[in-house]
From Swiss-Prot:
This is Aconitate hydratase A. Involved in the catabolism of short chain fatty acids (SCFA) via the tricarboxylic acid (TCA)(acetyl degradation route) and probably the 2-methylcitrate cycle I (propionate degradation route). Catalyzes the reversible isomerization of citrate to isocitrate via cis-aconitate. Could catalyze the hydration of 2-methyl-cis-aconitate to yield (2R,3S)-2-methylisocitrate. The apo form of AcnA functions as a RNA-binding regulatory protein. [4Fe-4S] cluster binds at residues 443, 509, 512. The keyword Metal-binding applies. It catalyses: citrate = D-threo-isocitrate; (2S,3R)-3-hydroxybutane-1,2,3-tricarboxylate = 2-methyl-cis-aconitate + H2O. The lineage of its organism: Bacteria, Bacillati, Bacillota, Bacilli, Bacillales. Belongs to the aconitase/IPM isomerase family. Its cofactor is [4Fe-4S] cluster. One of its GO terms (biological process) is tricarboxylic acid cycle. It comes from Staphylococcus epidermidis (strain ATCC 35984 / DSM 28319 / BCRC 17069 / CCUG 31568 / BM 3577 / RP62A). One of its GO terms (molecular function) is metal ion binding. InterPro entries: AcnA_IRP_Swivel (IPR044137), Acnase/IPM_dHydase_lsu_aba_1/3 (IPR015931), Acoase/IPM_deHydtase_lsu_aba (IPR001030), Aconitase/3IPM_dehydase_swvl (IPR015928), Aconitase/IRP2 (IPR006249), Aconitase_4Fe-4S_BS (IPR018136), Aconitase_4Fe-4S_dom (IPR036008), AconitaseA/IPMdHydase_ssu_swvl (IPR000573). Keywords: Iron, Iron-sulfur, Lyase, Metal-binding, RNA-binding, Tricarboxylic acid cycle.
């Protein structure tokens, strides 16, 4: 039943002869609950959501009142967030849809109504994560890679296609269309929804969650959204809210404008560095100030995209005139654009730089005119390097101690060379710092016509000067939508990119997520034989160790323009601002400034070729634009027929033996330590997305099931099969488990025998005798992708608790939703400080009385009988997380609730 507050807030406005209902935030000010003009715009969007969806059960007056007091009472309370839609990509989307199919089967098995297992909000899945760069630097690369993609993934695509027929409210955008976040920005996002609610046309803000951490990109157009784990997204699809504490909102005041030579990429990398230093994990970031009006929407989207890299839940740009201009540019309906403006102005959510600034938790100032051309690396996006310092910083990193900013090698590394004899008879020499991969990739940048056309102009000037890319550099161009192909073609710049080897290889994430494909065999052999430190330069958003290619140890993020420039140089061991890139056809040195376009040149090109007609043409038949997809043969049966022999799609074991009622929270006793890790362990480390080695537990499983090595595909592509994924948990070739000294990769010591073995093998031995497991970790545990399998795999290995110094937001949430207890060391304490070496038996004194952020007693019993006692913080961040944990996970809770209805 709706409350008095909600009823009083219900208002109407008229537009073009049509009446619209909306829930007026000003009502809260009239009732003395909030000063709306002082609230950050992102908080206004959340407040509208709880006001409109208040039902006096899940969302109550107390939630409205708590959020209305933002900034006045230490932000106490929690937000039940029910987004208006959900987006998925195929790597995380397949396991989400598998879980829905499994939930439906479980419902059927106990005699329940399977129609209760249907998305209750619109769901769009965009297939973008599976294409790999096998073929490149040739005109046929796109077709060859797409053909291989369908061959490798036919069974997965058949399953996803089946789901479009089996589930309501579910659509799939076919392969070779684009990258989910770019498709979302250019086409899917409405900015304001109009839906029929109780017979009334009701207007409200577009909001979403997505199963990819870079879902945050959509905040660039003023749509509030962020990445969640697949499990949380599934709960959202089924009508369950996400709960989180009322966030702090850090305001970033932008002034002035970007100078000549700097790009949106440079700004995004600078913002990432500044906000990482500030510490914004779990917080909202909102951009305001006079500099905002100097940022085209595409630049805002680039900055918003990298919110996971700066650690924030989102980086929000409120809707303003520039947002409407972008909607018009991308072919959105004129009447709808008019509605967006009218509604947001009526409801105090339309940004105007002339209005008074909101009151933020804290404010950071950033002068856009101070942004310099930059890269970041070699192993983390927040490690900013000015272009002018790149040569010096690279050389320093080679001999710096092994870690986030060093490789731990000695000076002799600079004397190494690898001689390459190509199959065509030509030869080349690679040395330390040479570039093996140069990729224009990722929605972070390919959604931005300014940097993409800028890269095309760099290529044009380079070709005209007679510059060429060395033969050992693997070049690729993988845009996030077909619109990019259209404007590069129409501008005449694609031919120059082609001349340098940046041919179109596919529409998808490719190199940015580790789908860079193989290097030439002769290069791989030479680099491996010499153990040469080679590099990559990519226009992506992540460069974590081991992510881009197993043989490439140093990876640098840069703008598409700099990717082209570095590809031409062939090395990162160069001062591009002062040293020549190469010699032109006239024999003269060519410098970066000789091939760099002016801001005006780029802007004029964008104005000329980026048109609404282009967007309308490319998106007019978006769900059926791929003939190979349309021809997939699928059944329309509502229950999926799991094939026991499939190595891609299996019915997971999460619901096996599920009781009708949840159990009680009980102490954890005599756990053994399976992993002890340092800082910055990423979800890539925990659950890799890339290649499956033949000698790994996952590789052996596939061989045992008659899968040839060439058909292994990647971990990411096999996320619908829990048997592969549990074997791949903690299996990244670069992860360093301190319990298996002298090894790199997924190994541990099995304490009963002292034997070093694969983590999966040890976990299964522990499971046989009923021993639970624990993981010890440092700061920022679980940073990176919103990879639910990092938590699912942890659960299936038998890990009962993780004890870390700090967590990245999404992974902590995912652990709880998989029934794994996240504990946090007290400030100043760590495994090392407490003297824990991993050989201990760990017990945790937790019970039904536990509350969010309580302290619990942890006991560590050493081999000699010595006892170490310490207190750890229970990282349940809301009351509902207690229920998730009690049920053994959120999906188990959803199933029990649906059965009880």
């Amino acid at each position: 039943m709706a409350s008095n507050i909600k009823e009083q807030a219900k208002k109407q406005f008229e537009l073009n002869g049509q009446s619209y209902t909306y829930y007026d935030l000003q009502t809260l000010e009239e009732k003395g609950l909030a000063k709306i003009s002082k609230l950050p715009y992102s908080i206004r969007v959340l407040l509208e959501s709880v006001l409109r969806q208040e039902d006096d059960f899940v969302i109550t007056d107390d939630h409205i009142k708590a959020l209305s007091k933002f900034g006045n009472a230490g932000n106490e309370g929690e937000v039940p967030f029910k987004p208006s839609r959900v987006i998925l990509q195929d790597f995380t989307g397949v396991p989400a849809v598998v879980d829905l199919a499994s939930l439906r089967k479980a419902m059927n098995d106990v005699g329940g109504d399977i129609n209760k297992i249907n998305p209750e909000v619109p769901v769009d899945l965009v297939i973008d994560h599976s294409v790999q760069v096998d073929s490149y630097a040739n005109p046929e690369a796109l077709e060859r890679n797409m053909k291989l993609e369908f061959e490798r993934n036919y069974e997965r695509y058949q399953f996803l296609n089946w789901a479009t027929k089996a589930f309501d409210n579910y659509n799939a955008v076919p392969p070779a269309t684009g990258i989910v976040h770019q498709v979302n920005l250019e086409y899917l996002a409405n900015v304001v929804h109009v839906r029929d609610v109780d017979g009334e046309k009701t207007a409200f803000p577009d909001t979403l969650v997505g199963t990819d951490s870079h879902t945050t990109m959509i905040n660039g157009i003023g749509v509030l959204g962020w990445g969640v784990g697949g499990i949380e997204a599934e709960a959202g699809m089924l009508g369950q809210p996400s709960y989180f504490p009322i966030p702090e909102v850090i305001g970033v005041r932008l002034t002035h404008s970007l100078p000549q030579g700097s790009t949106a990429t440079d700004l995004a990398l600078r913002v990432t560095e500044e906000l990482r230093k500030k510490g914004v994990v779990g917080k909202f970031v909102e951009f305001f100030g006079p500099g905002v009006q100097h940022l085209p929407l595409a630049d805002r989207a680039t900055i918003a995209n990298m919110a996971p890299e700066y650690g924030a839940t989102c980086g929000f740009f409120p809707v303003d005139e520039e947002s409407l201009k972008y909607m018009k540019l991308t072919g959105r309906d004129e009447e709808h654009i008019e509605l967006v403006k009218e509604y947001l102005q009526q409801n105090h959510m339309f940004f105007d730089v002339e209005k008074e600034d909101p009151e933020y938790t804290d404010v950071i100032d950033l002068d856009l005119s101070t942004v310099e051309a930059s890269l970041s690396g070699p192993k983390r996006p927040q490690d900013l390097i000015f272009l002018s310092d790149m040569k010096k910083e690279f050389e320093k990193s080679v001999t710096a101690p092994a870690g986030n900013q060093g490789h731990g090698l000695d000076q002799s590394e600079f004397d190494k060379k690898a001689e390459i004899n190509f199959n065509d008879g030509s030869k080349a020499t690679m040395k330390t710092g040479d570039i093996a991969i140069a990729a224009i990739t990722s929605c972070t940048n390919t959604s931005n016509p300014y940097v993409m056309l800028g890269a095309g102009l760099v290529a044009k000037k380079a070709v005209e000067k007679g510059l060429k890319v060395p033969e050992f550099v693997k070049t690729s161009l993988a845009p996030g939508s077909k619109v990019v192909t259209g404007y590069l073609r129409d501008s005449g710049l694609q031919q120059y990119l082609d001349d340098l080897g940046f041919n179109l290889v596919g529409y998808g994430c490719t190199t940015c997520i580790g789908n860079s494909g193989p290097l030439l065999p002769e290069i791989e052999k030479a680099v491996a034989d010499e153990d040469l430190l080679v590099t990559s330069v990519l226009s992506g958003n992540r460069n974590f160790e081991g992510r881009i290619h197993p043989l490439v140890k140093a990876n640098y993020l840069a703008s598409p323009q700099l990717v082209v420039a570095y590809a031409l140089a062939g090395t990162v061991d160069i001062d591009l601002q002062n040293e020549p890139i190469g010699k032109g056809k006239d024999g003269k040195d060519v410098y970066l400034q000789d091939i760099w376009p002016s801001i005006q040149e780029v802007s004029d090109t964008v104005d000329k070729v980026v048109t609404p007609e282009l967007f309308l043409e490319e998106y007019k038949n978006v769900y059926h634009n791929n003939e190979m997809w349309n021809e997939i043969d699928v059944t329309d049966e509502p229950l999926y027929d799991f094939d026991p022999n499939s190595t891609y799609i299996q019915n997971p074991t999460f619901f096996q033996g599920l009781s009708k009622e949840p159990g009680k929270i009980e102490p954890l006793k005599s756990l053994r330590v399976m992993g002890k890790f340092g800082d910055s362990v990423t979800t890539d480390h925990i659950s890799p997305a890339g290649a499956i080695g033949k000698d790994t537990p996952a590789g052996k499983y596939l061989l045992d099931h008659d899968v040839a090595i060439r058909n292994f595909n990647s971990y990411g592509s096999r996320r619908g099969n829990h048997e592969v994924m549990v074997r791949g948990t903690f299996a990244n070739i670069r992860i360093k488990n301190q319990l298996a000294p002298g090894t790199e990769g997924g190994f541990t010591t099995y304490w009963p025998t002292g034997e070093i073995m694969p983590i999966y093998d040890a976990a299964m031995k522990y499971k046989e005798d009923g021993t639970g497991l624990v993981v010890l970790a440092g700061n920022d545990y679980g940073m990176g992708s919103s990879r639910d399998w990092a938590a699912k795999g942890t659960n299936l290995l038998g890990v009962k608790t993780v004890i870390a110094q700090s967590y990245e937001r999404i992974h902590r949430s995912n652990l709880v939703m998989m029934g794994v207890l996240p504990l946090q060391f007290q400030q100043g304490e760590s495994a090392e400080a407490l003297g824990l070496d991993g050989k201990e038996e760990i017990s945790v004194d937790i019970n039904e009385d536990v509350q969010p952020h309580d302290f619990v007693n942890v006991t560590a019993k050493k081999e000699n009988g010595e006892i170490i006692n310490f207190k750890a913080i229970v990282r349940f961040d809301s009351l509902v997380e207690l229920d998730y944990y009690r049920h053994g996970g959120i999906l188990q809770m959803v199933l029990r609730n649906k059965l009880a209805q």
